[in-house]
């Protein structure tokens, strides 16, 4: 009897101790678990990634990350070429989340899996190739673009504007990236009648209209056989809203150790998102081929601590963002700027979360603009750091190429500004040119189709206002084009730059004859 009693007590102890010891294991919150699972996915460790995504689905049903996790389970199976399982999981996503953000991508994934099951030859599995590239629409081929990015035109009237467009056409340019926003203090187009110091160049009720000129410029561009993308801001499109601090982003001041208003919109505020949707909806009504997101669709390492952002993060992660949790040994440099010696794991979770939020905002705006023009194409500006170093990209800008790839932009516009890199990194021209060639190589490898990689070449030194010498332009083009016939954008367009002399450098005929 005594032995039975002891045995029973031992059994009770074991049963009661087991859950306790399990509970002492480090359990990641949904956001951290999602980030770690995504990292496994990109490393090709899909079975492990599936386990992480499943934990989110099963243990945190109220999290916004559940729908994304269900979608990613399907992508993992697709990447492993388990096509029946992929179809099952992606169809489950469509059924469970009919209003989800990944509806189109899930449908494309199902289509690809079904084609493989019908007997089409399967591609050789590669660990490094994200399945996102497979899930792009097979029938939708983008053209290679040679662009002039226009931040300013010196023409005094539309006749002179047309003359510039004809010159670009003859030089081999096929696309104009036209600035349709006006920041206070920047140069105003000479051919417009400015009604406001800041705003936009198309008709809308969601921002001050400097002048409704986009339609006329588009007509000129099309008349001369070119295409036009409207280049527009997002975070910095807070024109005329200085009196609304609640719409502003908040940043942490390392010197005062306090929060303060930062430049630009708080993209977590519902009214701000409605305003941007209205802006993009109106822009989409114009006869344009596409829209280029300005490089302001970022959040730096000390932005956004707004109330709305903090509340949204708390809901997903279970704790509020705080500077004390994020930054390792901040210090003031000789230049007066503040840097940190490192970032905590919690900071990286916050930065990755901000990246996802920004990409979802972009997706929302693309869908809104396509309501009136379903054929609109979209390009997103990316810092080159987001291509060569995911950790730096997400830490400094809340931006990564891999994150952008998940949202299926038509073009990935990489700001390969070598002169700027020389200044920022204190390096010589050759090293900067080689760096941009490396950026092109990595971008093409990640994106797949070189035409979708839009390498932006700096042709004016911002500091000295020197136009890039032709020899230097040839060197950077040679380095970039060595990795494929990528699309190109010359920035900023300036009349003195020798486009005609460089035309043969980017044409396929020249490349194939060498």
PLM segments and residue spans:
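Catalytic domains of carbohydrate-active enzymes, especially glycoside hydrolases
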Residues: 160-187, 285-290, 404-412, 480-488
């Amino acid at each position: 009897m005594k032995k039975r009693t002891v045995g029973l007590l031992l059994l009770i102890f074991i049963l009661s101790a087991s859950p306790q010891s399990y509970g002492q294991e480090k359990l990641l919150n949904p956001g951290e678990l999602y980030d770690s699972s995504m990292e496994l996915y990109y490393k090709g460790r899909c079975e492990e990634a599936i386990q992480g995504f499943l934990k989110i689905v099963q243990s945190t049903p109220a999290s916004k990350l559940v729908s994304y996790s269900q979608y990613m389970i399907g992508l993992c199976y697709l990447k492993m070429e388990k096509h029946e399982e992929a179809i099952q999981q992606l169809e489950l996503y469509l059924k469970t989340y009919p209003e989800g953000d990944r509806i189109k991508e899930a449908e494309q994934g199902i289509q690809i899996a079904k084609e493989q099951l019908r007997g089409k030859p399967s591609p050789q599995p590669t660990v490094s190739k994200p399945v996102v590239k497979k899930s792009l629409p097979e029938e939708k081929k983008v053209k290679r673009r040679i662009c002039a990015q226009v931040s300013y035109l010196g023409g005094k009237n539309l006749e002179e504007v047309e003359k510039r467009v004809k010159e670009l056409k003859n030089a081999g340019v096929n696309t104009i990236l036209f600035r349709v926003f006006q920041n206070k203090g920047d140069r105003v187009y000479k051919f417009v009648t400015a009604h406001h110091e800041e705003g936009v160049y198309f008709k809308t009720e969601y921002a001050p209209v400097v002048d409704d000129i986009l339609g006329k410029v588009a007509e000129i561009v099309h008349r001369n056989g070119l295409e036009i993308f409207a280049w527009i801001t997002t975070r910095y499109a807070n024109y005329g809203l200085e009196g609304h601090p609640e719409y502003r982003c908040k940043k942490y001041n390392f010197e005062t150790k306090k929060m303060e208003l930062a430049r630009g919109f708080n993209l977590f505020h519902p009214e701000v998102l409605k305003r941007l949707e209205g802006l993009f909806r109106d822009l989409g009504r114009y006869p344009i081929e596409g829209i280029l997101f300005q490089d302001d669709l970022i959040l730096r390492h000390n932005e956004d601590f707004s109330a709305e952002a903090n509340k949204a993060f708390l809901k997903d992660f279970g704790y509020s963002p705080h500077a004390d949790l994020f930054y390792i040994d901040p210090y003031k440099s000789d230049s007066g700027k503040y840097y940190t010696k490192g970032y905590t794991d919690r900071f990286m979770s916050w930065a990755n979360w901000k990246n996802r939020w920004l990409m979802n905002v972009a997706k929302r705006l693309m869908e809104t603009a396509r309501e009136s023009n379903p054929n609109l194409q979209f390009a997103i500006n990316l810092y080159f750091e987001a291509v060569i170093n995911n950790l730096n990209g997400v830490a400094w800008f809340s931006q990564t190429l891999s994150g952008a790839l998940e949202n299926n932009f038509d073009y990935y516009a990489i700001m390969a500004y070598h002169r700027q890199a020389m200044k920022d990194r204190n390096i010589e021209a050759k090293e900067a040119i080689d760096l941009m060639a490396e950026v092109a190589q990595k971008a093409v490898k990640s994106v797949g189709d070189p035409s979708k990689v839009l390498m932006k070449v700096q042709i004016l030194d911002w500091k000295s206002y020197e136009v890039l010498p032709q020899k230097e332009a040839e060197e950077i083009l040679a380095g970039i084009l060595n990795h494929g016939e990528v699309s190109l954008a010359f920035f900023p367009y300036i009349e003195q730059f020798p486009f005609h002399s460089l035309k043969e450098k980017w044409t396929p005929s020249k490349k194939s004859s060498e």
